A protein has these predicted regions:
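Active-site nucleotide/adenylate-binding loops and adjacent lid/helix of ATP-dependent enzymes
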Residues: 1-65
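Short beta-strand-to-turn element immediately C-terminal to the catalytic PLP-Schiff-base lysine
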Residues: 8, 36-41, 71-73, 142, ...
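C-terminal active-site "lid" helix and adjoining low-complexity regulatory extension at the edge
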Residues: 147-191
Length: 191
């Protein structure tokens, strides 16, 4: 299940296509939450001229928990809950790359069925997209309704000291050097 998402093309007014309530406005391309804004209804709609991107997506803001699953060599590793630090509105660029800007709870404390569903969906997305070596899929989880939503698959997940994939690998007793070796070996099979 995916959140309701609308495409907003260059020249279209944002106010014409928005959802009632909260939603996420983000560029169609890019990464690391660059250009992402949380919109809290009609009164907080930014001017489209504020964005350097031509095409945007308006995605319904769903769930209360942000989750992620790394798949390494066709095997999902674990589910991590990502929490932005108190001084961050959401898991934005700073929260991803600066120390002490986010908290990673590993493994995520969600019902077993939802945990297994996240692992299964991440593996399925990895295979459908044709990923080799590594991918990381992001989810939102609605605790009240016990509903998992898939947001996206990252085909080149971060590999910094604050990145989620190396942390998940380490949790599964896979060192960074071993993880990199697996990624290289998987890529070399395609050559």
């Amino acid at each position: 299940i995916f959140p309701k998402t609308l495409q907003i093309n260059e020249g279209e007014k944002l106010s014409v296509k928005i959802y009632k309530g909260f939603y996420v406005l983000k560029p169609k391309s890019g990464g690391s939450s660059v250009g992402v804004k949380i919109i809290k209804g009609q009164n907080s709609i930014p001017n489209k001229n504020e964005f350097k991107w031509k095409d945007l997506m308006a995605e319904e803001f769903v769930g209360s928990m942000e989750l992620t699953v790394t798949v390494l060599k066709d095997k999902p590793l674990c589910v991590t809950e990502i929490k932005a630090a108190q001084n961050e509105e959401f898991y934005n660029y700073r929260a991803k790359y600066e120390r002490n800007r986010s908290i990673h709870e590993i493994p995520a404390k969600i019902p077993k069925q939802s945990y297994e569903q996240a692992m299964s969906w991440a593996l399925r997305a990895h295979k459908i997209v044709g990923c080799k070596g590594i991918s990381r899929s992001d989810f939102r989880y609605d605790k009240i309704n016990d509903q998992l939503y898939m947001l996206e698959i990252n085909t080149q997940p971060g590999m910094t000291e604050t990145s989620l994939s190396p942390e998940q690998a380490l949790f599964c007793n896979i060192s960074l050097s071993e993880m990199v070796k697996i990624i290289i070996e998987e890529a070399s099979y395609e050559c």
